[in-house]
Amino acid sequence: MKKRNVIRNAAVLMTTLVFVLTFITQPMFAHGATSQVITKIYTTNKVVALTFDDGSDGTNIPAILKILSDYNVKATFFLTGKAVSHHPAKIKSIIAAGHAIGNHSYSHPYFTKISTTQMKSELSKTEALVKNLTGKTTKPFFRPPYGAYNTLVLQTVGSVGYTKTIKWNIDTIDWDGRSAYRIYTKVLNNIVPGSIVLMHTGAGAKYTTAALPTIIKGLKAKGYRFVTIPTLLGINPTQITYVVKAGDTLYAIAQRYGVTVQQIATINHITNVNLIYVGQVLIIPR
């Protein structure tokens, strides 16, 4: 009997130890830090966001900026750290032209294949380079390289301030050198209100600059208005943010800032005003 008790106690101890070790070796995240994945917004307003991923060469940036300026269109550029290091003057010109920016990692790895430490390093290196060069932040917008993400990626990037993971609902696949006509038809045939369009700035996307004017004219003819990602999401970079604490309610937060519950709910895409959570980052409208 005594021997059985010893064996049983040893088994319980081992099970407990395994559980504890498993728990403490898992990455820890603030509750509610998970990044929100956005492929488009749901609206009846004819708005569209043109986005450009900038790899290490940025060959077409000057031509893209010229076209956007000619048609008075603002876009969003997702920057890699290598791009910032490789062509800083072009990055400055993006900011000077009034376009929005986001973080596209430093070296463009699959985030689903690297460690959480590496993910954070990829983001922080790019953020530091962009801030030092332009004084602007890439937060809270992250575009995952190759569009690849999983729960761990979303938890990790969210925990360091990238609360919006921006994907797309229209991929032009311009990087493979396809014709301007194919790029144009991909956009015009799939456009819906609230769309996010993916294009690239690199040399591989050699017909993007030829397609861009026709895309802009075609969408304008359909009644579309061009906006940046911050505008599409109702986020102004100068707006105040508030981190939800234990005991908070949307009503109390709204009273504190002199706005309505509905205003906070709308700008943060909250469908149930009773469901907010500790650690949630809320944008406060002005």
PLM regions and their residue ranges:
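Soluble non-cytosolic domains of exported or imported proteins
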Residues: 55-59, 78, 85, 113-120, ...
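Active-site beta->alpha N-cap acidic-glycine motif
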Residues: 33-113, 118, 125, 129, ...
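Sec-dependent N-terminal signal peptides of Gram-positive bacterial secreted proteins and lipoproteins
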Residues: 1-30
